[in-house]
Amino acid sequence: MKDSYISIVIAYLMVTFILVSSMPIEGEKGELGPHRLPCPPGYENYCFNGKCVHVVAQDEPGKPCYSCICDEFYIGERCGTLDLTNPGYFLKG
């Protein structure tokens, strides 16, 4: 009985993880969201392979916080690293 309960819990957690990990992050594919604004002019090239956003919630006094939403297959603070661990990169034709 205990083993079947553990198996059910593990299966539930696995399904939940798969469902949650497949959901797009808010702002990743659609709207920027209420706490993200487009970066000001002059920051067009801030992100090497992605889109610059102003993260208002992370601002410090006198120091705005800029971040990047990386293009597909790129990772890193400014999207400068090609993610070769992503299997989709090799399947893209």
Swiss-Prot record:
It comes from Rhytidoponera metallica. GO terms for molecular function: toxin activity. Residues 1-30 form the signal peptide. Expressed by the venom gland. Gene3D superfamilies: Laminin. This is OMEGA-ectatommitoxin(02)-Rm1c. Ant peptide with probable defensive activity which acts as a potent agonist of the mammalian epidermal growth factor receptor (EGFR). Mimics, both structurally and functionally, vertebrate epidermal growth factor (EGF) peptide hormones. In vivo, intraplantar injection in mice causes long-lasting (several days) hypersensitivity of the injected paw to both mechanical and thermal stimuli. Its long-lasting effect is unusual for venom toxins whose effects are usually immediate. Belongs to the EGF domain peptide family. The lineage of its organism: Eukaryota, Metazoa, Ecdysozoa, Arthropoda, Hexapoda.
